[in-house]
Curated annotation (Swiss-Prot):
This is Large ribosomal subunit protein bL35. Belongs to the bacterial ribosomal protein bL35 family. One of its GO terms (molecular function) is structural constituent of ribosome. The keyword Ribonucleoprotein applies.
Amino acid sequence: MPKIKTVRGAAKRFKKTAGGGFKRKHANLRHILTKKSTKRKRHLRPKGMVSKGDLGLVVACLPYA
């Protein structure tokens, strides 16, 4: 049986936590930041968690995480 390939883009975007979840970065903080309020940008700064509905897709992309 050949090894399962990891999706490299997913490996760079998600980090597994001790509890089995995955950390992720929030979207909308790369460019066009002048029109976004400081509060909005501040709330986008900390890491988020992958939602329960998307967890299966992330696990399939990262077989060895």
